[in-house]
Amino acid sequence: MTKYIIITGGVLSSVGKGTVAASIGLLLKNRGYKITMVKVDPYLNVDAGTMNPYMHGEVFVTDDGAETDLDLGHYERFVGINMYSYNNITAGKVYFEVIKNERQGKYLGQTVQIIPHVTDQIKSMIRYASNMANADITIVEIGGTVGDIEGLPFLEAVRQLKLEEEEGNVVFVHVALVEFLKVTEEIKTKPLQHSVQELRRIGIQPDIIVARSVVPLDEETKKKIALFTNVKPEYIFSNYDVNMTYEVPLILEKQGLASKILSKLNLPDNQPNLSEWIRFIDNLKTADKEVKIALVGKYTKLKDSYISIKEAIYHAAAKLHIKPVLVWIESTDIENSKEAIDKLKSVDGIIVLPGFGSRGVEGKILAIKYARENNVPFLGICYGMQLAVVEFARNVLGLEKAHTTEVDPNTPHPVITLLDEQKKVVQIGGTMRLGSQKVIVKEGTLAYRIYGNIEVYERHRHRYEVNPEYVDLLQKGGLVISGVSENGLVEMIELKNHKFFLGLQGHPEYKSRPLAPSPVFIGFLRAAAGV
C-alpha cells in the first residue's frame, strides 16, 4: 500500500518546498524505496505552457509532452525519475474534469460542490499518479502558501486523504520561513507559528516542520517552535543557506529527516548510499579551472526562466571538473549596447537560449554571428538553432532579408516557417510539437561524436521548423544538417571547421541530471574549456 508525504508551505512562496520535496525523494529512493512525486498548483491554468516565464519561471517539458511547473525539473534531477503529465495537478485540470463529469451526468443529478466533488477529484488524481508509478511512497507538494484562497480545496483534499488512509500512511511536512534579523542577530519564529496555526484551523496538524532559515536553528529556537506548533523538537529541522541547492539533501540527511519520516510511516530505515551525490558536489566545489559561458536570452532578469539549462551546465561541469562562470546577457541589450557586445569578447562559449517572439531576436542573431566569425564554441537551443539558420542565410548565403515567419510573415526568404501540422491550429495551449522525439543523427558529424548513437531522443517544444525548401541551399552553402526527425524535419545543424558550433531543435537540458549529464553540454563545455 502506498504511503503519502504531503509538503505544505507557509509565510511566503518560493520558500524551498520544491527543493525539500525533491531532497526527501532522493533520500528515500537511496534507501531502496520506489518514489513518485506530485506537484499541485492551485492556479486555474490547465498547465504552465501559456505562462510568461517572468511570472512563473521555466516551463518544464516531460517525455509525454506535458508543459509543467519547474519543480518537476527539480524532481527529475534530484530523484532521477521521469515525471509525466499526471505528476502535475493544477486547479485548471481539476475543475475541467469536474465540469466535464457534470456535463456527462456522472454526478447523477447532484449539486456539484467543492466538497465532495472537487476534493474527490483532487484525491483521485493524486492516487492515480501514485498507482501509475506503483510507488511505495508518493510525495505531494502543495503549491502556494497556507492561507491562499485558491489553495483551500487542495488542503481540504489532503486532510481528507489522511482521514481515509490507514493510520501511519500519511505524513505532513510543513516548510516555512523563520526570519533572521541581522540587527539583533535573532531568529524570529512568529510568522512560522502563525502559518501552522492557519494549517491547524484547516484541520491539518503537521508531523514535521522544516524551517527555512539563513542559519541553522539552535535547540532553544526549536523548543520555542515546538511549544507553539505542537511538533516535538526532534521533528523540527533546519533548511539553512548553503552554497548550492544540491547540498540540501545532505544537510537534511545529517539532521535525520528521512529517518524521522520513515518512523512516522512505520517503514524500515535502510542505510542510504549517497557517495555518488557527494562526489558530484565535491567535483563542483573543488574545480578551479574557470570557463566563462555567455547565456543570451530575453528573460535573463529571472534566472529561473532557464533553470534547466543552468543546471545542465553545472552537471556537465562536475563531470569535467571545471568551474563554470555564467555571464547572463539580455539579448535586447546586444541590440542597443556596445557594452553588451563587448561581454561576448571575454567569454569562452556562447549559448543562445530558447524563447518565442520578436523581442531580442536581432541581439541573438548578433551573438550567433560573433560566435561563428570568431570561432567561439556555440550552442543554440530551439529558437537559438532556428536563429542560427537565419544568421547563416543572411551573412553566409547573402539572403539579407532572410527571417523566421514567426517574426516577419512577409520575409522574402522564410528559412524558418510554421510546421505543416501547426498551420490549422487555432488553440494556443498544449498544441505545439511537444515531448520526446526521435532524432536520426548523421554519422561523421559533431552531433554523432557527442551522442555516439545514430538514434537519440530529446524533448521538444516548438511550432516552427527549418523550411524544407531551403535545406538544399543551406547545405550547398556549408551548413551541415547533422540530425533529422523520422519524417525529415531538421533537428540539428552544425558548421565544419569550427571549434564547436551546434544547434538543436530539441531541449537537451530537460534530460540532464547531476549523475547523468547531457552529452550535448559535456561536449560544449569541453570545447569551451579546451579540455
From Swiss-Prot:
This is CTP synthase. The keyword ATP-binding applies. ATP binds at S14, V15, G16, K17, G18, T19, D71. Residues 292-531 form the Glutamine amidotransferase type-1 domain. CTPSs have evolved a hybrid strategy for distinguishing between UTP and CTP. The overlapping regions of the product feedback inhibitory and substrate sites recognize a common feature in both compounds, the triphosphate moiety. To differentiate isosteric substrate and product pyrimidine rings, an additional pocket far from the expected kinase/ligase catalytic site, specifically recognizes the cytosine and ribose portions of the product inhibitor. The keyword Ligase applies. The gene is pyrG. Its EC number is 6.3.4.2. SUPFAM superfamilies: Class I glutamine amidotransferase-like (SSF52317), P-loop containing nucleoside triphosphate hydrolases (SSF52540). L-glutamine binds at Y54, G355, Y383, G384, M385, Q386, E406, R463.
